[in-house]
C-alpha cells in the first residue's frame, strides 16, 4: 500500500516531524541563556521543586506562621514558649544526603559571614595559610543563622542559636578543638610547644586559638594583614555576644517594663478585651479598678510578680527591635517586632517567623570552600546543591506537620504552617504537601476508565487492549522523561497533572479505536473477495434483504455486517479518490509555521504536549498497519488455498471417488483426509459420520459481542437518534445555527468586565522592587537622587511597609558618620558602610558582591523589600497595586526599568493583566488552531469543499471558546489546561464522523469510475454512514459515565475534594464538545445534500427504481415506542418503489390434497399468460389466508365486530386484518412454517383458497348476524378493549427467555398475532327469532411472505448499470463455482438458486448455536427449523431407562401403553420391510 493511501501513517510522520522541530526550536531558545551544559544522565529524577529558582536572589526566606484558632492574643509567654519548641526541633533536624548528614546550620544564611567577605575576596581566601583558612571556616560554621522571630526580643534566642550552631555541644566542640589544634601544630612544625585549650564553648575556642595563631610568623601579602584579620575576628566575636538588656522569657521583666505593661492595661477600658489581650483572669478586674500606675507602682509590681507573668502578655511597641544577636542594627526595619505578628480573625492572633536559607549558588560556594580547606576532592555541583536545598525545605514542612500533631499544639489550639513563596504552589493542588492524594487520584481516574472501557468497549479482547493502553503509557513516560526534563529533574506540579489528563484522553480514544478496527477487520464478511468493490452500491446491498417488519435481531445482524464491511472497504480500498492529493507534502509544510506561531504566541509548553501525545499516536499507527498487513497476507494465502482446493476438487470428481462414495462402499483413508482438509466446507467429523460446517465469515458473534444487552441497546438508540438528526431540515438549520450563536455569545461573554479577584489573606504579601543599574559608580549622585525620590514616593503609600531597603540603611550610616549635611556622597562611602556595618549590609545585601579593589560592579543589581498591609480591604490592595504600577512607569527611564515581583502583587496585577489580555490570547489561539484544523481537513478529508473546512474548524474551535467563556465568567485557574482539553476533546469527538461523511460524499461525487445511485436524485435524500458516529457516541457515553463517578467520589472523599471542581469542568468540556460535534454532523450533512443534488441534477437524468429504500426503515426499528420519537417511513425522502426482495430460504413445497375444483396437477404453471398470472394470484392469496376453527377464536379473544365490520366475512368464516393480528400476538405460529401436522387444529397455510361463491354466500349471511349483535357489542366495547389489551400484555410470550420458542429481541414484534388468553364468558344474550348459524371457521389474512413478494427489479429487461443497482442474488451468483457438487439442502430452495446462494442462505448464524452471544440472549432458529421446534420429537422405542428408581413415579398403565405402542411400531416396521423392493445390484445408482 502506497504512502498516499495510508493516511494514518502520513499523519504520524507529520506529527513526529513537527514535534521534534518544536523541541529543537525550544532547546535553541533556552540555550541562549544557558552558560554551561553538564551531563546529568538520560533519565531524570522526579521530585517536588518547592520553588522555581529565582534569578538574582540574595537569600531564600522560609516563613512559618502560628495561628491561634480561637483568636487569642499570641503575645504571651505561653505561645512564645510553644514557638521556641518548634525552633529547637528545627535546630536538631538533620537530613541525609548522599550518605552524609546535614543540619540546618549547614545551609542557613549567615549575615555574620559578611565580616570576612568584606575583607577577603574569594580568590584571596585560598591564598591564606592553612591554619587561618581553618580558623575562618570554623568561625563561619559557628555564625548564627538569620532568624527573624519574636524570641529575638528575649535572651531565649541565644539558646536556640547555640543549639542550631552547636556552640555548647561537647562532642562537636571537642572535634572543633582538635581540628584547630591540628592546624596549629602543622603550622609550627616539629616543636615541643603543643598548646591545648580546655573549653567546651565554641566562640571561646575561636578566640583562644586565634590569639595563638596570630602570633605565628607568616609571609606578608598585599591583600591582607594579620592586624586586619585580627580585627575581623574581634568584630565577629563581639557580634555574637549576648545583649545586656534582654531578659529570659520565663523571668519577670525589669521594673521599667512593668510601667509599660500597666500603662497598656489602662488604655484598654473593656475588661473582656483586656482579659483576652493580656491573658487575665476573672478575679483580676477587681484589682485593676482604680489602679494608678504611678502611685501604685510597687503594688502593681508585686501583683504582677505574683501572677508569675507567664499568663500576662508582653506588649510589643510598634518600633521595638527584636534583633537578638544582630548588633549595630539600630533603625533596621528588618527586625521590627510588629512584623512578627499579624491578624487572621482577631488582632495579634498570628505569630510569624522567618528563616533565611542560602541559595543553591551560595551552598555550592560554601561546600567547595569547605572541601578545599579539608583537602577533599569536591563532588558538589549546582544540581546537588539544589537537591540539598529542596530536601531541607521538604523536611521543614514535615517537621511542621508533626509539630501540629503534637499534644501541646492541639491543647493550646495552635495551627502552624509554612507560607509558600510562590503563588503557583498555592494553586498547584498543594502537590508539595499532598503528593500522595494527587498520585492516588490519578491512579483512581485511570483505573475507573480502564474498568469502564474493558467492560463496555473492549469486550472482544479486554486484556490485549489494557496491555496496549499501559504500553502507550510506558512509552510516553520514557520519552517525556528523556526529552522534557529540566535541570535533570521533572517537577510534580499541576502542569504535569494536565499532561497526564491529556494523555489519558488520547490514549483511551486510540486504544478503543484500534481495538474496534482490529476486531472488525478480523471478522470482515468480505475477506475472501477482492477489495474494493468499485460501486457505491456496496454500501447498501448487504442490508437489501431486510423486511420492513423484521425483528431487532435481524436488524442487528445486518448492521453488524454493514459495519464490518464499511471498515474493510475503508481499509483495503485502492480507489484513486481515497488517496491523498499529490500535493500533500507541500501543504504539510504549512504545519511548521502554524505550530511555531502557537508555541511562540500562545503556549510555550506545546513541545511537551506534543511529546505526550506522540507515542500513543505512533503505537496506534503501528498496530493498525500490522492489522492491515496480516489480513492482506491472510487474504493472499486464502486465495492460494482456494486455487489448490479447486484443483483437488476437480481431481476428486474425475478419479471416481464420488462413484465409490455413492455406490455405498466405505470411504478410504485418503477420502477422509480429503474431506477434512476442506476447511471451507468441513470442520470436524461427529460420531455418526456427520460433518459440521465450519464457521464462515458470516459469523457476526464477535462483532456483536458487546458485554451486555444495554450496550447494544444504547448503540441502537444512538443510531436512531443519528438518523433522526440527519433527516432534520429546517430544524437542522436551527440546531447548528444555535450552536453558532453560542460560540459568538461566548466571545461576547469574555468581553464583559467582571470583578474577578477576591482578597487572599493567606498569600505572601511581600513585594520586591528589583533594580539593575549600569555605571553606578560614575553616576552615583544622580542615581542616589532618583532612588531617594523613589523611596519618598514609596513611603507615601500608607499600605506599604519597609522590610529592607539598603538606601535607607546607607543614609542612616551617612547621617551618623558624616554630620555635614552639605557633603556629597560618592561610591567610596558605600564601600565604607559595607566595612563598618557588614552585618547590616548583609541583611539588606545587594545582589552583586562589591569588590574593594574594583568598586561597584556594572550592572549593579539590588532589591528593595516591602510588605503590603492587608486589612481585609481588597479595594485598598488593588489601589496599592495600581499606584505601584504607576510608580514603575514613572521611573522606567531614570532607574533602568525596575521590576516588581511578589505573590500578592502578582496575583492582583497578574489577574488584571491576564484577564485583560485573555480575550486577545484566546482569539489569537483560536485563529491559529482554526488554520491548523483547516489544514488537517484539506489534507486528510478527501478533497473537501471550502464550506466543510469552515464548518469543521469553526465548531471545533467553538468548544475552546465556550470553555474559555466559562473560565472567564467564573475566573477559574489553570486556564490553559481546560482550553487545551476542550479543543482536543472537540477534535476527537467530531473528526471520525465528519471524516466518514466526507468519504461518503466523495464516493458519491466520483464521476468517472463510480455509477450513480438513483436514490440520490434532487428530490431524494442521502443516507449517510453511521458507524463512526455510533462509535463516538459510545466512547463519549463511557467517558461521561466514568467522569460522573469520579466527580461523585471526589466530592465525597475528603482527600479528593480539591479535585471536584476540576472534574466538573472536564465534564462540561465533554458536553460542550459533543454538542458541537452534533452541529458539525448536521451542518455537514445538509451541505453535502445540496452539493450532491446540484451535481446530479446537472449531470444525469435519473430514473425511478431503487432497492435502497429499506435503509430508511432501520430508524423505526431502533427507537422503542416508549421514547415516542416517531420516524415514519413517509418522513424520509428515499421511498422504495416496490417491495424489497427477501432472500431467506423459502419452505419446501408440499402438495395439498386435491379437491374436485382443483386444476390438473400436470398443467404447466410456468406457462406465460393470463392463466399463469391467475395461478400466481391464487397462490399468493393462499399464502395470505388461513382458516381457523371458530371455537379457537371463541376460546381466545372475541372478534371486534363493531370496529372491524369491513373486514369480517359473512357466514361461517370471519376475516381478521393484520392490525388486529398484531395486537393479539399469535401470528408467529402462522408464519413460522407452512408444513403443519395433521393433528393440529389449524390447517396448512398453503392449502387451497376457498371458492369465490362460497365466500360470497358466507358474506351475505354474516351481514344479518352483524346487525343483530352490533348493538349489544357496542355497549361492552370499552370494557372488553381494556381487558383485551391487559390480557394480551400479561400473557404475551417472553421471547427474551431462551426456553421460549421464537427470536429474542427487545421490542414488540411487528407481526400479526391472535392471543389465546381465556377471558370470562359473556353473559347470555337473547336468541333472535331467526337465528343465524354461528360461524365455524375464521379466515385470517396476513402479510405476504418474503418468497411471495414480486421481484423488485424486473430482470427480463437488461439492467442499466447507471440507474439500477445490482441484485443481491446476482452479486452472490457471480461467485458460484460450477465445479462444486450441488448443495445438500438444495431441495429446500427454489430451483434457480445456485450453490453460492444456498450457502449464503444457510448462514452459520442461523444454523449453529455456537456463537459468542451476551447473557440472556437466545440464538434464533433458522426460519425452516420452526416446524421441528413446534412438534414433539419422534418417540424412541429402543430407549432403555437407567437403573434405579426414577425421581417421578411412572404409573404401570403408562408403561403398559408404551409397550403396546412399541409392539405396534415393530410390527409396522416388519410389514414395511417385507413390502420394500430389493436394492439394485448396479453400482452408483
Swiss-Prot record:
Residues 1401-1422 are annotated as: MX regulatory domain. Residues 1143-1175, 1228-1252, 1275-1306, 1348-1384, 1442-1485 are annotated as: Disordered. It comes from the Eukaryota. Residues 1131-1271 are annotated as: Interaction with fem-3. The keyword Membrane applies. PANTHER family: MX REGION OF TRA-2 RELATED-RELATED. The MX region mediates a post-translational regulation, essential for the onset of hermaphrodite spermatogenesis. Interacts with tra-1 and fem-3. This is Sex-determining transformer protein 2. It comes from Caenorhabditis remanei (Caenorhabditis vulgaris). The lineage of its organism: Eukaryota, Metazoa, Ecdysozoa, Nematoda, Chromadorea.
Amino acid at each position: 500500500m502506497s504512502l498516499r493511501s495510508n493516511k494514518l501513517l502520513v499523519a504520524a510522520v507529520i506529527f513526529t516531524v513537527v514535534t521534534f522541530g518544536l523541541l529543537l526550536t525550544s532547546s535553541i531558545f533556552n540555550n541562549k541563556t544557558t552558560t554551561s551544559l553538564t551531563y546529568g544522565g538520560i533519565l531524570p529524577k522526579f521530585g517536588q521543586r518547592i520553588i522555581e529558582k529565582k534569578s538574582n536572589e540574595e537569600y531564600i526566606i522560609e516563613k512559618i506562621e502560628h495561628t491561634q484558632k480561637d483568636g487569642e492574643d499570641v503575645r504571651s509567654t505561653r505561645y512564645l514558649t510553644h514557638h521556641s519548641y518548634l525552633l529547637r526541633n528545627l535546630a536538631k533536624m538533620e537530613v541525609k544526603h548522599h550518605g552524609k548528614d546535614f543540619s540546618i546550620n549547614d545551609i542557613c544564611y549567615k549575615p555574620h559571614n559578611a565580616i570576612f567577605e568584606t575583607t577577603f575576596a574569594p580568590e584571596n581566601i585560598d591564598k591564606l595559610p592553612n591554619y587561618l583558612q581553618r580558623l575562618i571556616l570554623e568561625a563561619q560554621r559557628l555564625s548564627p543563622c538569620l532568624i527573624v522571630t519574636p524570641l529575638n526580643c528575649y535572651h531565649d534566642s541565644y539558646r536556640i542559636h547555640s543549639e542550631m550552631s552547636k556552640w555548647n555541644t561537647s562532642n562537636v566542640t571537642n572535634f572543633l578543638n582538635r581540628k584547630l589544634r591540628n592546624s596549629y601544630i602543622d603550622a609550627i612544625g616539629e616543636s615541643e610547644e603543643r598548646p591545648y585549650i580546655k573549653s567546651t564553648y565554641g566562640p571561646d575556642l575561636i578566640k583562644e586559638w586565634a590569639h595563638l595563631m596570630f602570633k605565628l610568623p607568616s609571609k606578608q601579602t598585599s591583600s591582607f594583614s594579620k592586624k586586619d584579620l585580627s580585627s575581623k575576628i574581634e568584630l565577629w566575636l563581639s557580634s555574637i555576644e549576648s545583649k545586656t538588656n534582654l531578659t529570659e522569657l520565663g523571668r519577670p521583666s525589669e521594673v521599667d517594663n512593668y510601667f509599660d505593661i500597666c500603662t497598656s492595661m489602662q488604655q484598654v477600658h473593656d475588661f473582656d478585651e483586656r482579659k483576652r489581650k493580656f491573658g487575665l483572669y476573672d478575679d483580676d478586674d477587681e484589682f485593676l479598678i482604680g489602679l494608678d500606675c504611678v502611685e501604685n507602682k510597687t503594688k502593681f509590681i508585686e501583683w504582677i510578680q505574683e501572677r508569675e507573668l507567664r499568663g500576662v502578655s508582653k506588649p510589643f511597641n510598634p518600633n521595638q527591635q527584636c534583633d537578638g544577636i544582630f548588633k549595630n542594627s539600630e533603625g533596621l526595619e528588618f527586625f521590627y517586632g510588629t512584623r512578627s505578628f499579624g491578624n487572621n480573625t482577631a488582632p495579634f492572633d498570628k505569630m510569624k517567623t522567618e528563616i533565611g536559607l542560602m541559595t543553591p549558588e551560595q551552598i555550592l560556594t560554601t561546600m567547595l570552600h569547605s572541601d578545599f580547606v579539608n583537602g577533599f576532592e569536591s563532588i558538589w555541583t549546582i544540581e546537588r546543591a539544589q537537591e540539598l536545598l529542596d530536601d531541607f525545605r521538604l523536611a521543614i514542612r514535615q517537621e511542621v506537620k508533626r509539630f501540629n500533631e503534637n499534644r501541646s499544639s492541639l491543647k493550646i489550639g495552635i495551627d502552624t504552617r509554612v507560607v509558600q513563596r510562590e503563588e503557583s504552589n498555592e494553586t498547584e493542588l498543594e502537590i508539595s504537601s499532598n503528593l500522595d492524594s494527587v498520585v492516588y487520584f490519578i491512579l483512581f481516574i485511570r483505573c475507573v476508565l480502564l474498568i469502564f472501557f474493558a467492560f463496555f468497549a473492549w469486550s472482544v479482547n479486554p486484556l490485549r487492549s489494557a496491555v496496549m493502553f499501559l504500553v502507550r503509557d510506558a512509552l510516553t513516560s520514557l520519552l517525556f522523561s528523556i526529552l522534557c526534563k529540566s535541570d535533570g529533574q521533572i517537577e510534580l506540579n499541576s502542569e504535569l497533572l494536565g499532561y497526564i489528563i491529556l494523555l489519558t484522553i488520547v490514549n483511551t480514544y486510540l486504544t478503543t479505536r484500534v481495538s474496534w478496527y482490529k476486531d472488525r477487520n478480523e471478522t470482515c464478511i468480505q475477506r475472501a473477495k477482492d477489495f474494493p468493490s468499485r460501486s457505491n452500491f456496496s454500501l447498501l446491498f448487504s442490508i437489501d434483504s431486510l423486511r420492513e417488519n423484521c425483528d431487532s435481531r435481524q436488524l442487528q445482524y445486518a448492521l453488524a455486517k454493514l459495519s464490518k464491511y464499511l471498515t474493510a472497504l475503508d481499509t483495503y480500498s485502492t480507489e484513486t479518490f481515497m488517496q491523498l492529493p499529490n500535493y500533500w507534502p507541500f501543504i504539510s509544510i504549512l504545519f511548521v509555521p502554524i505550530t511555531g506561531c502557537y508555541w511562540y504566541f500562545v503556549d510555550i509548553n506545546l513541545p511537551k504536549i506534543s511529546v505526550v501525545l506522540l507515542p500513543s499516536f505512533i503505537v496506534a499507527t503501528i498496530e493498525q498497519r500490522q492489522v492491515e498487513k496480516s489480513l492482506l497476507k491472510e487474504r493472499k494465502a486464502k486465495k492460494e488455498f482456494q486455487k489448490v482446493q479447486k484443483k483437488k476438487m476437480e481431481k476428486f470428481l474425475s478419479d471416481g471417488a464420488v462413484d465409490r462414495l455413492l455406490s455405498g462402499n466405505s470411504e478410504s483413508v485418503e477420502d477422509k483426509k480429503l474431506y477434512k482438509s476442506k476447511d471451507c466446507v468441513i470442520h470436524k467429523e461427529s460420531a455418526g459420520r456427520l460433518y459440521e460446517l465450519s464457521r464462515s465469515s458470516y459469523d457476526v458473534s464477535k462483532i456483536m459481542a458487546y458485554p451486555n444487552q444495554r450496550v447494544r441497546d444504547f448503540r441502537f438508540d444512538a443510531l436512531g437518534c443519528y438518523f433522526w438528526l440527519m433527516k432534520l431540515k429546517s430544524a437542522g438549520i436551527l440546531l447548528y445555527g444555535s450552536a453558532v450563536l453560542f460560540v459568538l455569545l461566548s466571545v461576547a461573554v469574555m468581553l464583559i468586565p467582571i470583578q474577578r479577584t477576591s482578597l487572599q489573606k493567606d498569600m505572601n504579601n511581600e513585594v520586591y522592587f528589583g533594580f539593575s543599574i549600569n555605571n553606578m559608580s560614575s553616576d552615583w549622585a544622580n542615581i542616589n537622587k532618583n532612588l531617594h525620590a523613589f523611596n519618598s514616593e514609596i513611603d507615601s503609600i500608607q499600605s506599604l511597609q519597609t522590610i529592607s531597603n539598603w538606601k535607607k540603611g546607607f543614609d542612616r550610616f551617612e547621617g551618623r558618620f558624616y554630620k555635614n549635611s552639605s557633603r556629597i556622597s560618592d561610591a567610596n562611602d558605600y564601600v565604607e558602610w559595607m566595612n563598618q556595618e557588614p552585618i547590616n549590609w548583609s541583611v539588606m545585601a545587594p545582589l552583586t558582591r562589591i569588590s574593594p579593589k574594583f568598586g561597584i560592579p556594572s550592572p549593579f543589581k539590588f532589591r528593595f523589600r516591602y510588605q503590603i498591609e492587608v486589612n481585609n480591604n481588597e479595594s485598598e490592595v488593588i489601589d496599592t497595586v495600581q499606584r505601584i504600577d504607576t510608580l514603575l512607569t514613572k521611573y522606567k527611564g531614570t532607574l533602568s526599568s525596575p521590576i516588581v515581583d511578589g505573590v500578592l502583587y502578582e496575583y492582583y496585577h497578574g489577574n488584571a493583566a491576564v484577564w485583560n489580555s485573555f480575550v486577545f490570547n484566546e482569539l489569537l489561539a483560536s485563529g491559529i488552531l482554526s488554520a491548523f484544523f483547516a489544514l488537517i481537513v484539506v489534507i486528510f478529508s478527501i478533497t473537501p469543499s471550502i464550506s466543510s473546512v469552515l464548518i469543521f474548524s469553526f465548531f471545533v474551535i467553538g468548544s475552546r471558546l465556550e470553555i474559555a467563556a466559562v473560565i472567564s465568567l467564573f475566573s477559574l485557574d489553570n486556564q490553559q489546561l481546560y482550553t487545551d482539553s476542550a479543543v482536543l476533546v472537540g477534535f476527537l469527538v467530531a473528526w471520525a464522523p465528519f471524516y466518514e461523511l466526507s468519504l461518503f460524499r466523495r464516493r458519491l461525487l466520483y464521476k468517472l469510475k463510480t455509477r450513480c445511485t438513483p436514490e440520490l436524485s434532487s428530490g431524494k435524500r442521502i443516507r449517510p454512514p453511521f458507524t463512526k458516529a455510533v462509535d463516538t457516541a459510545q466512547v463519549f457515553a463511557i467517558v461521561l459515565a466514568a467522569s460522573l463517578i469520579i466527580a461523585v467520589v471526589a466530592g465525597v472523599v475528603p482527600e479528593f475534594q480539591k479535585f471536584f471542581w476540576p472534574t466538573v469542568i472536564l465534564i462540561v468540556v465533554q458536553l460542550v464538545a459533543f454538542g458541537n460535534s452534533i452541529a458539525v454532523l448536521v451542518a455537514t450533512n445538509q451541505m453535502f445534500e445540496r452539493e450532491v443534488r446540484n451535481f446530479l441534477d446537472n449531470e444525469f437524468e435519473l430514473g425511478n427504481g431503487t432497492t435502497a429504500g429499506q435503509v430508511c426503515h432501520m430508524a423505526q426499528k431502533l427507537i422503542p415506542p416508549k421514547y415516542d420519537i416517531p420516524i415514519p417511513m413517509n418522513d424520509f425522502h428515499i421511498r422504495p418503489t416496490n417491495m424489497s426482495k427477501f432472500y431467506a430460504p423459502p419452505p419446501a413445497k408440499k402438495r395439498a390434497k386435491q379437491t374436485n375444483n382443483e386444476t390438473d396437477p400436470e398443467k404447466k404453471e410456468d406457462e406465460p399468460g393470463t392463466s399463469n398470472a391467475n395461478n400466481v394470484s391464487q397462490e399468493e392469496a393462499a399464502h395470505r389466508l388461513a382458516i381457523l376453527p371458530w371455537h379457537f377464536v371463541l376460546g381466545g379473544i372475541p372478534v371486534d365486530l363493531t370496529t372491524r365490520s369491513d373486514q369480517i366475512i359473512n357466514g361461517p368464516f370471519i376475516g381478521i386484518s393484520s392490525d388486529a393480528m398484531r395486537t393479539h400476538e399469535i401470528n408467529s405460529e402462522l408464519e413460522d412454517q407452512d408444513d403443519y401436522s395433521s393433528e393440529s387444529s389449524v390447517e396448512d397455510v398453503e392449502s387451497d383458497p376457498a371458492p369465490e361463491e362460497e365466500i360470497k354466500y358466507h358474506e351475505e349471511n354474516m351481514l344479518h348476524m352483524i346487525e343483530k349483535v352490533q348493538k349489544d357489542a357496542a355497549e361492552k366495547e370499552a370494557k372488553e378493549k381494556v381487558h383485551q389489551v391487559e390480557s394480551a400484555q400479561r400473557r404475551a410470550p417472553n421471547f427474551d427467555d431462551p426456553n421460549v420458542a421464537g427470536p429474542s429481541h427487545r421490542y414488540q414484534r411487528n407481526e400479526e398475532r391472535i392471543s389465546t388468553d381465556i377471558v370470562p364468558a359473556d353473559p347470555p344474550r337473547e336468541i333472535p327469532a331467526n337465528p343465524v348459524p354461528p360461524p365455524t371457521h375464521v379466515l385470517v389474512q396476513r402479510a405476504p411472505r418474503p418468497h411471495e413478494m414480486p421481484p423488485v427489479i424486473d430482470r427480463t429487461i437488461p439492467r442499466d448499470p447507471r440507474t439500477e443497482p445490482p441484485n443481491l442474488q446476482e452479486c452472490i451468483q457471480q461467485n458460484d463455482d460450477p465445479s462444486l457438487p450441488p448443495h445438500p439442502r438444495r431441495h429446500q430452495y427454489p430451483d434457480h438458486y445456485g450453490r453460492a446462494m444456498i450457502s449464503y442462505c444457510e448462514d452459520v448464524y442461523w444454523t449453529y448455536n455456537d456463537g459468542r452471544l451476551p447473557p440472556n440472549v437466545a440464538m434464533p432458529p433458522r426460519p425452516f427449523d420452526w416446524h421441528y421446534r413446534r412438534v414433539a420429537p419422534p418417540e424412541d422405542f429402543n430407549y432403555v431407562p437407567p437403573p434405579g428408581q426414577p425421581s417421578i413415579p411412572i404409573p404401570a398403565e403408562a408403561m403398559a401403553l408404551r409397550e403396546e405402542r412399541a409392539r405396534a411400531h415393530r410390527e409396522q416396521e416388519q410389514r414395511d420391510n417385507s413390502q420394500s423392493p430389493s436394492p439394485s445390484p448396479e453400482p452408483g445408482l
